[in-house]
Amino acid sequence: MMRSGFPRKKSDMNANAAKLPLEWIENPRAGRAETCRALERLLPPGITGIARQLHRQLDGYRMSPLKSLSGLAALLGVGGIWVKDESQRLSLNSFKVLGGSFAIYQFLRKKLGIRDRELTVSELKSEKVRAHLGDICFATATDGNHGRGVAWAAKELGFRCVVYVHERTSKPRIRAIEDYGAEVQVIPGTYDDAVRAVTRDAGANGWQIISDTSWEGYEDIPCWVMQGYTTLMAEIQEQLAGQGISQPTHVFVQAGVGALAAAVAGYYRKLFGERRPTLAIVEPDKAACLYESIRCGDGRPHSVSGTLDTIMAGLACGDPSPLAWEVLSRCADFFLACPDFVAAKGMRVYGVPVAGDPFIVSGESGAVTLGALMYLAEYEGLAELRRKMQLGPDSQILLINTEGNTDPDHFRRVVWEGGVSVPQEFRRKL
């Protein structure tokens, strides 16, 4: 079965939870001059422009905002904090639709045998093209946001969609997928079990899988998903340029299977080469498969097992995507593993910002990078990491708020009721 060859272990990071608010490891393989075949495949020349051309045609498309948290930056002693707010992406509350829509577009273009030109969305919706394509059912597994994006794209183009979720997926996230006409199947176990189940059933039912994670023999579509994500990176660079900034010095990006993180890493490696920003990958400590893969030090992706019980539902993945791993193992500098209270703190800080800063609605998976940055900037026990990352007054830091309020009930428990509180030893000294 896919990815069955990955070594699996239960993480023992929580044994050190009393020492630091997060665990970190430096990537010894992050050579700034090194390239890899996976990166060349991921981002061939011109692919970001093709993705942006498609996304501009989507109903309701506009660039999501890039927000400056200048007040918080001053408080933390850094030059600037810039947040790409994907909670405002196409009214879908997440960036994920960028990947799912582009993967479907590329699949249909290939199925139609069109290589010498790009298709328009109007052409894809035309009766002539639909008659040629016939009945297609797209299928995927999700923790919520990717499935919602695929369901939206399938509905926009008039195709059926089946989405598999694991048993811990919240009812609001399931309803959000069903709102776009998809059939939802709930699978016992974790997200990784849902991936295995949809792979099995898709073969039996003739469905076409649109997954953001790869496995042996299935790489084209996950590659297209990651290419779709580069639209938001191109938007960021355009928006930063409008503020007189050529590039961020540091990027903190969250990771589940690693698809978005690899797209970010690959985009900046291709754009800036050795001058690329310092990149930190941020994961839940209970689902830190990329952190664990770096820690093992053998150059191979490693899985983590267990229930993956974290409030960061969108990042609760035990199996890294091999395609993403090939890029991240060479292009990411640091890997951080965070307990849930780090994400909860980020949610509250976004929602009740420093005076003068804009407020941002951010879900658990969207906010963990802000929480991690705050501890990194202020906690004395992380001084070595600050030094290694060269974080200081000249730093221009990029964060991506990958999701908004995708589970309103849990959001209120954390933000309104103070759920998942910060332990006393890790609270700010006021």
Predicted regions and their residues:
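PLP-dependent amino-acid enzyme catalytic core
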Residues: 3-430
